[in-house]
């Protein structure tokens, strides 16, 4: 990324707190998310990375006792997506998610990708076929599955299943894509394929990724946030975070002194 090009703000958390019942898991997190860039969230287990990520598409709404305090604004309209007046289904149409382990539906390859389109009210077969092909192509798996779209998704390899899940997320044309440790269950070759795919996707989408893999964060991201005990310790350009961090705790974590 050229230093002369100022990134555009796509979303922003503002003094975000999150509670699992009485437990305060996130503490006053204010963090920018830049448009068409990859932002990595790093930190030890239990630091709040995935909790923070799941705030962006209101996944916590699915469980009673969880509550938010603060805002996440989504541009260009500046809407606070955590507002109870905002439909979480609409949020999930704008912000899609790919999980740690591939989670294809017990349906055909075609229907896995078409699912979100049908939810959006698209039923015309020719439109579905066009958009499914586009999503599978953008997820770099079309050539591997184009002759077996009626096969069950479970018949695919782990790496193929994860790319199928990415295609499913892409099909609804989201503004932001969330990746929660998307390669932790994959072998090195499949991991490299997903990382290469993310580099291509950021040309059109804004990406937030949670990873425990420091090398992966350094390879794929433009910006990195280090979280610890529910707080942001440091946020900066990824190169600076990994070479000359401002906070000693960041350096200690990256170099393996704790974590």
Curated annotation (Swiss-Prot):
One Gene Ontology cellular component annotation held by this UniProt entry: plasma membrane
* Cell location: Cell inner membrane
**InterPro entries assigned to the protein according to its UniProt record, in alphabetical order:** AAA+_ATPase (IPR003593), ABC_transporter-like_ATP-bd (IPR003439), ABC_transporter-like_CS (IPR017871), P-loop_NTPase (IPR027417), PstB-like (IPR005670)
Which Pfam families does UniProt cross-reference here? Answer: ABC_tran
**Catalytic reactions of this protein:** phosphate(out) + ATP + H2O = ADP + 2 phosphate(in) + H(+)
| Positions bound to ATP | 43-50
Q: Which UniProt keywords apply?
A: ATP-binding, Cell inner membrane, Cell membrane, Membrane, Nucleotide-binding, Phosphate transport, Translocase, Transport
Q: Where are the bilayer-spanning segments?
A: none
The record gives the membrane topology as: Peripheral membrane protein
Domain ABC transporter stretches: 11-254
The UniProt subunit note reads as follows: The complex is composed of two ATP-binding proteins (PstB), two transmembrane proteins (PstC and PstA) and a solute-binding protein (PstS).
Q: Can you say what this protein is called?
A: Phosphate import ATP-binding protein PstB
